[in-house]
Every structure is written in structure tokens, then in C-alpha cells.
Amino acid sequence: VVLGCSDSRVPAEIVFDQGLGDLFVIRVAGHVVAPSLVGSVEFAADRFGTRLVVVLGHSRCGAVLATLDELERPGGSRSPNLASIVDRVRPSVETLLATELREDRDALVREAVRANIRASADHLRHGSRVLEELIQRDGLVVVGAEYSLETGVVEFFDGVPEPSP
């Protein structure tokens, strides 16, 4: 299962060199975790026995940028629907504005993208009784990864199991 951003530059099938039908892909701006998306992950993991969920974010994510813009200049979004995405991203990035990262926009965006990926992965791990049971009972793994638009490389950095000795 891949929960990814709706950005057209990050099609999971191409990123992971898979054919159509090989992946269960769920896409939404900023890979925000809302109830319908959790239900989709639960469906794939429970019904099809999928044992890996990848939360795939990417560099320069527009949803993260929109959230940072809103936090820096409140009142920018006139769309309640876009505001709902910003509101889901906000908790994972707003504390970064109180750090020295606020002085370096590129570093802030890089860390905010990763914080949002971590938050989405954590929400899946701990925000669903079904997924929690699958993690405990069946070895489901939820990992966070970032796709670099610049290099085409995916870096797995959150929730990656330690290699067996």
C-alpha cells in the first residue's frame, strides 16, 4: 500500500518501477490522513493481506508549502476544503516555526516535509484499531519515505525495521 501525495510528479507505480495493479495506491494532497484514507489502508491491509504501508512524501510538497504560508500569513486560504488539508498538516509543522529553521526557508521546508510524513505514518500506526491489530498480530509495517523531485531517489527514514542479524 502506498499513501502518497496527489502531486502528478510522484506516481508511485513509476517511482517504485511497478506495473498497473501491482500497488494499492491512495493519493491525496500532502498525504494527509483522514478517516476515509485510513479506511482505504485498513481495507487493503485486512482484505488483501498487505504487510507494508509506505507513506510517500516528496520534496517541495505543495500542501506543506501552503500550510507554512498559512502559518506565516494567516487568512490566506479562502477555500474551506483547502483549509481542511492545511489544518491536518498544521500540527506536524507549526512547531518548526519556533526553531532556528524559520531563518532558512529551504531547510524549514525540508524538515516540514519530513515532519508531515512522520505524522501521517504515526497516525496510521496509532490511530486505527484495525491497523494496530495488524501490526501486532500479522507484522504489518508502516514506513515513511521521501521522494526527491531533484534526484528521483526515495529515502526510507521513518519506521524502517532493523535488519535481522
Put a short name on every predicted segment.
Residues V1-V32:
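Short, conserved "active-site rim" segments that organize catalytic pockets and cofactor/ligand binding
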Residues V53-S59:
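Ordered, amphipathic secondary-structure segments that act as subunit-interaction surfaces
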Residues G21, G30-T50, G62-P165:
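Divalent-metal-activated hydrolytic enzyme cores
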Residues V2, I26, V55, G144, ...:
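Divalent metal-coordination and catalytic microenvironments
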